[in-house]
Regions:
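Divalent metal-dependent hydrolysis catalytic cores, especially in the metallo-beta-lactamase
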Residues: 14-15, 28-56, 78-85, 127-128, ...
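Catalytic pocket-lining loop regions of alpha/beta-barrel enzymes
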Residues: 126-128, 135-243, 292, 296-297
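A general structural detector for well-ordered alpha-helical segments in enzyme core domains, enriched
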Residues: 29-33, 63-70, 113-120, 144-151, ...
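Conserved, mostly hydrophobic/aromatic
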Residues: 13, 34, 67, 71, ...
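Mid-to-C-terminal alpha-helical segments outside catalytic/metal-binding sites
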Residues: 1-12, 24-42, 236-241, 250-298
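Active-site gating/metal-coordination segments in enzymes
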Residues: 57-165
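Histidine-centered catalytic micro-motifs
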Residues: 9-19, 166-170
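Acidic-and-aromatic substrate-binding clefts and catalytic sites of carbohydrate-active enzymes
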Residues: 18-26, 50-62, 86-93, 105-111, ...
Length: 298
């Protein structure tokens, strides 16, 4: 625990569950992971490979239901983020044959993505979304994503709490360039976006001018190993725009601290990046218990 710091440590990036690439059984290993790494509060979401809406019978360690289960198990320390497939929506209009193009298409009308948006936040109690455009194969500024974000804005108002959207933003495909992320985030100023990896490695040269003017987007230093990638953004927009996570269990918490220590020189700034900034933005109430440990009260 970071009992000697002014702010709790809030790690923004941890994959939990079981898939072909991961065996992080959160029920058993999450709290030891956090305690060993000095993490007070942890944002968790599904492993990218195998992510789905509803937890299936064959694997109880994937799905948004699993993330909600972990959040319920550790409510004082964990917030969960949902994964939603933007392609599970009806087309709305014909694209083919040519003579019907643009006309209403009503053969498929159920919208599973929008349904899951409501279920994940209002029923399961999750705190937002994790989006991986590259891994899951969608342009982050596609109209299918925009429809989810439009609905999420409404759901946020219904839930009466600030939600967060963690976006894989390494600029490692045309689906998640700085420019594409800027294009969609500027249209949803009510939503809080965390730009995971802060454009490292391919987007570092345009990070500050594209994302910097958008106050609803935070630079998330998760596995951003090159200080020069974020140097201009730090100089122009200040420490208040930065947060960080571990990218566990694929990276270690020590990597996170090395990045933060190498970028921010004062203890006050490091404390803001490690937890203060995201807690202020989300507005989640927290307290310090008699034993010195921090606890969420949301």
């Amino acid at each position: 625990m970071a009992a000697d710091t002014p702010w709790p440590v809030f790690d923004t990036h941890l994959h939990v569950g079981v898939s072909t690439t991961c065996t992080f059984v959160a029920e058993e290993v999450l709290i030891p992971w956090m305690d060993d790494g000095g993490v007070d509060f942890q944002a968790v979401f599904q492993v990218n490979q195998g992510a789905c809406h509803r937890t299936p019978d064959w694997n109880p360690y994937i799905g948004n239901d699993y993330i909600a289960k972990i959040q319920r198990m550790f409510p004082e320390r964990v917030i969960g983020l949902a994964t939603i497939n933007p392609w599970q929506q009806p087309p709305g209009k014909y694209s083919y044959p040519p003579d019907l193009r643009g006309k209403p298409f009503d053969r498929v009308t159920r919208n599973l993505a929008i349904e899951e948006c409501h279920r994940a936040i209002l029923e399961l109690g999750l705190w937002g979304l994790k989006m991986h455009p590259k891994e899951h194969g969608y342009p982050v500024n596609h109209r299918a994503v925009r429809s989810i974000l439009t609905e999420l804005t409404k759901v946020q108002a219904q839930a009466k709490r600030r939600l967060m959207i963690v976006v894989h933003a390494a600029a490692d495909s045309t689906y998640n360039t700085n420019e594409a992320i800027m294009d969609v985030c500027r249209d949803f100023p009510e939503l809080l976006f965390l730009m995971a990896h802060s454009g490292y490695i391919w987007g570092g040269k345009t990070l500050a001018p594209t994302i910097g003017p958008l106050d609803n987007v935070l630079f998330d230093l998760t596995c951003c190993a090159e200080t020069q990638t974020v140097a201009e953004a730090y100089e122009r927009y200040g420490v208040e725009r930065f947060v960080t996570g571990s990218d566990g269990p694929f990276a270690t918490i020590e990597v996170k601290h090395a990045i933060v220590n190498g970028t921010f020189k004062s203890a006050e700034e490091r404390s803001l990046v490690l937890g203060g900034n995201i807690l202020k933005r989300l507005g989640i109430p927290w307290t310090r218990k008699a034993d010195g440990r921090f606890a969420l009260q949301g």
